Structure formats: C-alpha cells, structure tokens
Amino acid sequence: MRVIIEKPADGDEDEIIVRCREPDDEIMSLIYSIAAGRSKLTAYSEDGIVKLSPKEIFYFEAVDNKVFAYCEKQVYEIRRKLYELEVTFENSDFLRISKSTIVNVSKIVKLVPYFNSRLEAVLENGERTIISRQYVPDLKRKLRVEEDRR
C-alpha cells in the first residue's frame, strides 16, 4: 500500500481519497480511526467543560452510573453511556475489556497474565487495568496477537 500526502491549494479544504480494489477490514479500520480521531467528546471536570480528542483518552470506566474518561493526568466525566461510547468507537483503537471498562489499545504498553485467565494491561501513564477473560480473545484479535502453540 502506498501513502501519498499532498498539500491542497490555498482555499481548498482537506480531503482524504482512498483508492482500493475492495475496501477490506484494514482499510475500513483506518477510515474509521481517522473519522473518530477528528471527533471531540464533551467532558466535564471541576474546572469546567472541555473538548477531548479520543487520542488523549487512555480508557473509559463506568462507576456508580457515571462514565469517566481517564487521560494522562486528568479524569473527566463523560455524560454518555458506556455502550454508546463502545458503538461510537467500535472501529477505532477502543475496545471493551470488561463490563465497566473500554480501553484505548494504542495506549497499552504491556500485557501481563493475571488470575483466572485474565490479563492485566499496563498503560503508557503507568495505570493498570484488568481485562476480563471474556474479552481476552477480542483484545488478541485487535492486537493481532498470535497464540503460543507449544
């Protein structure tokens, strides 16, 4: 696959053109990632209301009927349901890893085996989160992890 970047003429808006014989999963995932990356989420904190880019978010977590977005150093309330975020970001780097958590897989630096066939994900900011065994196969597919067949 070739990638060509051209500067548009003055006054023209940015555009992305995809030329392919058949849009496969990889190309569609790339398109969805670009679209999701440009969208902003409204987030609330004690300091006020901010707009968050999805790439700033490490994970979402539902606690006591509220959903929070965890960024590198700040936590924000997101006034949407976890399942809505899952649908919004289903073809991007976000993946549900438990009943209450959706993680940005691009922020995972290490996966460590955990009790009862679960995994522990270590994120770029040092935080750790548990991947329920029910979601481990989805994560491995997303990360294209090969099974060790000894």
Language-model segment annotations:
Residues 141-150:
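Short, charged, intrinsically disordered terminal tails
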Residues 13, 124-128, 143:
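Short, highly charged low-complexity linear segments
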Residues 9, 22, 47, 82, ...:
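A broadly conserved detector of short glycine/acidic/proline-rich loop/turn motifs that flank catalytic sites
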Residues 26-124, 128-130, 150:
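Conserved binding/recognition cores within well-folded domains
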Residues 88, 138, 142:
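Solvent-exposed, charged/polar functional surfaces in cytosolic regulatory/catalytic domains
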Residues 130-133, 137-139:
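C-terminal structural segments of small proteins and small subunits
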Residues 20-22, 125, 133:
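Short, structured patches in soluble enzyme cores that scaffold and shape functional sites
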Residues 1-26:
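N-terminal regulatory/sensing modules of transcriptional regulators
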